[in-house]
């Protein structure tokens, strides 16, 4: 695809291994990988937002799936950043804002005010549970 000049965009929750394999393969093919990751402080906030969306006619997601995907997405974030040429992280807990930028795995910019979920994510080291090599096989 790259040799033919194609670019593409993939919207994802970063859950499961298939998205990591897709990103890895794209990287191997020479694509520039750019991630824009949006998160909120808790699954409870996500549930509330989804309930509001349902009231307005949007689709729902079962609570158990929200909880599962919330944690899984954060666990995959470290591995995904490792594959990215550029990763911008956004917090949407209260007001949507970008607060961190990674370039080639290095944190190059971070706001003075960082969200709770990001602090917790760094402290818990979610990246330690499964190696990237195990996930892309």
Task: Give the label of every model feature segment.
Residues 28-29, 54-56, 106-110:
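Short, low-complexity, polar/charged sequence segments that are solvent-exposed and flexible
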Residues 9, 57, 61, 88-91:
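Secondary-structure transition/capping residues
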Residues 31-79:
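A glycine- and Lys/Arg-enriched "phosphate-lid" helix/loop adjacent to the NTP-binding pocket
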Residues 80-137:
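NTP-dependent small-molecule kinase module
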Residues 23-26, 49-52, 102-104:
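Short, glycine/charged-enriched secondary-structure capping and boundary segments
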Residues 1-40, 73, 88:
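Glycine-rich phosphate-binding loop used to anchor ATP phosphates in small-molecule kinases
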Residues 15, 39-45, 94-96:
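Conserved nucleotide-binding/hydrolysis micro-motifs of P-loop NTPases
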